[in-house]
């Protein structure tokens, strides 16, 4: 995929002379483990710093999903109000705030970036540090062991994976549950989601690969679920106790085998699909080059789309984000495409809106149709070119 800037390296409009650093993205398949890995690692302190822009708390769909996770965890594991719940990579504390709303007060976030300050809004304890074996020892000493440990869209970002898992093992109770939720290899391939391959995402896991990995550190799988969140997610529950697996586990493993995740030809077809989409999208833009075209929503994955489909930046006038986003008044990394408030969309109605958060295409397009964009054509670049007139 060449060299690309970091997806979250947004440049303030007032600092437009600053240049982004480009890093390679090259994805490798491990046939034995059945997962994908970026062969270049950018340091954590570069990726996750005080200027990190992503906040789940400003997205209703994300908040709703995290509320569901909190509800299910409490119900399925008979969680008591005094049981310690630790969320690693807790960002602005949104997931933990859902536990608190449901009556659970013994909560701890672990967050290395500047978003940790938002835990204060919920009056939730937070450790402003990277999670590893060393920081886990401090957590264990001060807070004790956890009944529930969650990592939502964090595990695939982890650099020193062995040290991270050892840290989990150090702070989890014997009867505790470790919940991993991440983008899912099968859905990435099935839905042509090359946009998940940004520098923060070091690995893309199948269920088979997660089981194999966690068993090396003494964890047993208990439950596994897949969902359509973020274009396709997998949620896996591990414990230190030897337990009977949920029937879901073997069902998902059989689906992975039937799909061909262990067959290199599956990935060659995936690559071919992406190139076809690239051609179709270019032809669409070129045909409509006289139209007023904007992008809508800028999750990290959108940077990959814009750079791999490099012609897009020549057609898009700006990217619209919701008014509360920290990304407004910044440029898309490596471009002069400005991220502006979506309030502008009703003043300057676009002919075409390219929804870069394509996994929310139906929700976003319908919302803006109802808001007054009656004549706008809504476009999704993935999983294949889709146009809603």
What are these regions (language model features)?
Residues 1-60, 225:
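N-terminal juxtadomain amphipathic helix
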Residues 81-91, 293-296:
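Conserved class I S-adenosyl-L-methionine
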Residues 93-134, 315-330:
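Class I SAM-dependent methyltransferase SAM/SAH-binding core
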Residues 147-150:
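A conserved beta-strand element that flanks and buttresses the S-adenosyl-L-methionine
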Residues 162-177:
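A short glycine-rich, Lys/Arg-flanked "PGG" loop and its adjoining helix->strand segment in the class I
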Residues 175-183, 377-383:
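Conserved beta-strand signature within the Rossmann-like core of class I S-adenosyl-L-methionine
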Residues 180-203, 207-209, 214:
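Short, glycine-/aromatic-enriched active-site segment of Class I SAM-dependent methyltransferases
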Residues 231-274:
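Flexible, glycine-/basic-rich loop-and-beta segments that form/coincide
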């Amino acid at each position: 995929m060449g060299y690309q800037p970091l997806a979250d390296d947004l440049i303030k409009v007032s600092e437009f002379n600053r240049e982004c650093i480009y890093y390679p993205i090259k994805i490798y398949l491990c046939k034995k483990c059945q997962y994908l890995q970026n062969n270049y690692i950018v340091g954590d302190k570069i990726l996750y710093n005080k200027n990190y822009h992503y906040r789940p708390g400003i997205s209703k769909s994300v908040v709703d999903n995290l509320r569901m996770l909190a509800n299910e965890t409490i119900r399925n594991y008979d969680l008591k109000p005094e049981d310690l719940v630790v969320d690693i990579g807790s960002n602005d504390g949104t997931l933990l705030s859902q536990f608190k709303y449901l009556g659970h007060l013994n909560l701890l976030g672990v967050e290395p970036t500047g978003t940790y300050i938002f835990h204060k809004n919920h009056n939730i304890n937070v450790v402003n540090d990277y999670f590893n074996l060393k920081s886990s020892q401090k957590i264990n000493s001060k807070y004790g062991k956890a009944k529930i440990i969650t990592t939502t869209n964090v595990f695939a970002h982890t650099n020193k994976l062995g040290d991270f898992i050892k840290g989990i093992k150090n702070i989890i109770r014997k009867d505790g549950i470790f919940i991993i939720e991440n983008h899912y290899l099968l859905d990435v391939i099935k839905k042509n989601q090359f946009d998940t391959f940004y520098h923060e995402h070091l690995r893309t896991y199948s269920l088979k690969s997660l089981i194999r990995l966690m068993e090396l550190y003494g964890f047993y799988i208990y439950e596994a679920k897949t969902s359509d969140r973020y274009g396709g997610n997998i949620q896996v529950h591990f414990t230190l106790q030897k337990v009977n697996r949920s029937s879901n586990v073997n069902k998902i493993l059989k689906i992975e085998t039937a799909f061909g995740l262990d067959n290199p030809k599956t990935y060659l077809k995936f690559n071919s699909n992406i190139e076809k989409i690239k051609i179709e999208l270019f032809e669409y833009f070129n045909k409509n080059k006289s139209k007023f075209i904007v992008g809508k929503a800028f999750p990290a994955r959108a940077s990959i789309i814009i750079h791999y489909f490099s012609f897009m930046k020549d057609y898009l006038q700006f990217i619209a984000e919701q008014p509360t986003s920290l990304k407004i008044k910044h440029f898309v990394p490596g471009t002069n495409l400005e991220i502006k408030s979506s309030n502008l969309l009703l003043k300057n109605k676009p002919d075409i809106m390219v929804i870069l958060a394509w996994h929310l295409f139906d929700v976003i397009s319908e919302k803006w149709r109802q808001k007054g964009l009656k004549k706008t054509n809504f476009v999704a670049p993935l999983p294949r070119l889709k146009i809603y007139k």
